[in-house]
Amino acid sequence: MTTQSEYDYIIIGAGSAGNTLAARLTEDAGVTVLLLEAGGPDYRLDFRTQMPAALAFPLQGRRYNWAYETEPEPHMNNRRMECGRGKGLGGSSLINGMCYIRGNAMDYDGWAKEPGLEDWSYLDCLPYFRKAETRDIGPNDYHGGEGPVSVTKPKAGNNPLFHAMVEAGVQAGFPRTDDLNGYQQEGFGPMDRTVTPNGRRASTARGYLDEAKKRSTLTIVTHALTDRILFEGKRAVGVAYLVGDSDTRIQARARKEVLLCGGAIASPQILQRSGVGPAEVLNKLDIPVVHDLPGVGQNLQDHLEMYLQYACTQPVSLYPSLKWWNQPAIGAKWMFLGTGIGASNQFEAGGFIRSSEAFEWPNIQYHFLPVAINYNGTKGVQEHGFQAHVGSMRSPSRGRVQVKSKDPREYPSILFNYMSSEQDWQEFRDGIRLTREIMQQPALDPYRGREISPGIDVQSDEALDQFVREHAETAYHPSCSCKMGTDEMAVVDGQGRVHGLQSLRVVDASIMPIITTGNLNAPTIMIAEKIADKIRGRQPLPRSTADYFVAGDKPARGKPLREISHQA
């Protein structure tokens, strides 16, 4: 038994991109949209997703997290590694770390050098970043003031460790920047976050859907698991999906287009299950081939990161807030006033550096955290501490996503192939050693205790490599598995249209040709804003005329205030 309905557009996935498209397309009178989301609602009374400081909670369990695992990663001691992905209205913007980082201007200028992607330069993209954003301190040439995404800048009076860590980075010889999303990304400075003025997570469900839900032309179905995209010949005409635990396939038809916004894991999986992908993969599973497209699921990229943890000699870290007896007061202050520790994701400082002159723009990212704990909330150090998250930005390693079954409830096979190049290993060795130099600068003298992790005995290349193999974790930035472009491995063109098919687009982080320098939520929203104008037949926003930093022949680093020698 099937039931059927018809809409202008069907959007698969109510995440960072899907919600953006749903809101923008329904701004046009009479345009009907069906938005399908495999997860549930974004319950506004659930502190796990709404309180910024509770960011570790939605990663635990499977209510809001698909909780994928990789195949054994061959260069990481064959570990099966986490691959968390958001499930529910908001997608990964419902469970992410809320770091608002756009990437480096050179990322987009690099995309624009590819044939067919000429209009993806930084100055073409910047107007769409601005369109999406409302920054709490007001708009300027780089930031918006009227968009659906609430962005909060760190305020005076926040934790002194943030300021000490930025100062230490500057004392180590690296630049200072007052805005990681402004004129110059390179350097250390305050980190913006997607949090509302009253201290709530600013997911795309809150920012975009709250307005769009008021329109009768938008239909949202939660707990709707997409089985496959329906085709007539080479034209996408609809979607078959399941609701809840039912095995009844419901069919919905799209008069204009099907818009796939499942993210870098689900989008290639859904394409392959629908008969679009490498023919040899589909044939093994007896999936009828609609279109042999070898790049679907290939080119998978991510950011890997390490934690360097230190004891804190003054009682200024967030360690007491991890204790259950302190949490009711923190929760009450957040609930009723929208302020306090609960209102921040606690990633309020960070930076981007070049580990050597070989890189034209930053290849290492830092997040600073005034507590020593794993990102997913596990293995908290039982004392006052602080840590730096450090990771490489544009690894040459490439992975893949492959469907394992026709069953939409079966997870795909995921392999990132982390650390498969010598460049990866050199960047992590350099990153750890540079971080140690930063941590030894005078600004941290009042706070710095012993090195908890990796530990001062971990010094040689071999020891550092072993530590990375055992302890590096994902930064939860999968991307690039349905890349834009014109070469034989490209899946979509510069407007997200799937090569060789009609009426089907992919719009999410999977279409990035190369991963950006930083967190992926802001770029994903920008991509959706930009392609929304294409779908609507609107003229693109005028190119920005803002200036932006290009390192050129400037050195990656100046002379440090305190010289640190590395033990052999």
From Swiss-Prot:
Involved in the biosynthesis of the osmoprotectant glycine betaine. Catalyzes the oxidation of choline to betaine aldehyde and betaine aldehyde to glycine betaine at the same rate. Pathway: Amine and polyamine biosynthesis; betaine biosynthesis via choline pathway; betaine aldehyde from choline (cytochrome c reductase route): step 1/1. FAD binds at residues 8-37. Its EC number is 1.1.99.1, 1.2.1.8. Pfam families: GMC_oxred_C, GMC_oxred_N. GO terms for biological process: glycine betaine biosynthetic process from choline. It comes from Pseudomonas savastanoi pv. phaseolicola (strain 1448A / Race 6) (Pseudomonas syringae pv. phaseolicola (strain 1448A / Race 6)). Its cofactor is FAD. SUPFAM superfamilies: FAD-linked reductases, C-terminal domain, FAD/NAD(P)-binding domain. Belongs to the GMC oxidoreductase family. One of its GO terms (cellular component) is membrane. Disulfide bonds: none annotated. It catalyses: choline + A = betaine aldehyde + AH2; betaine aldehyde + NAD(+) + H2O = glycine betaine + NADH + 2 H(+). The keyword Membrane does not apply. Keywords: FAD, Flavoprotein, NAD, Oxidoreductase. One of its GO terms (molecular function) is choline dehydrogenase activity. This is Oxygen-dependent choline dehydrogenase. The active site is at H477.
